[in-house]
Amino acid sequence: MLVDSISEMNITIREATTRYINITCKSKETGEPFDFTGFTVQTYLSFGEYQEYVNTTIVENLVSYKIPAEASLGAAYGVAETRIFKDGNVYEILRINVNVRKAEKPDTEPNQNE
């Protein structure tokens, strides 16, 4: 496996909510948008017991996928790792470390002012 580079970032999401991830890729040397035309892509989510590959799209310099609500349910953290392939070799790895904030329970007490 030939890896040109690994990019890593951290995000926080709320438990049991669907999140759409869009990553715009730029050249580290020039800062210009990097064109991934002709590359293939694969994203693996790991949130406790929820571990699976998700549909990922790559258009020019934009990588997009969805973290489904059930992935973060009951999890404290997770990892989303996207591998970008060129000619069958791993060219780039985009790793997102995801902290999961527990969902707040709704107020079920009746409003005393009603």
For the regions a language model picked out, list residue spans one by one.
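Compositionally biased low-complexity segments at domain edges in trafficked proteins
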Residues: 108-114
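N-terminal assembly/attachment segments of tailed bacteriophage virion structural proteins
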Residues: 1-108
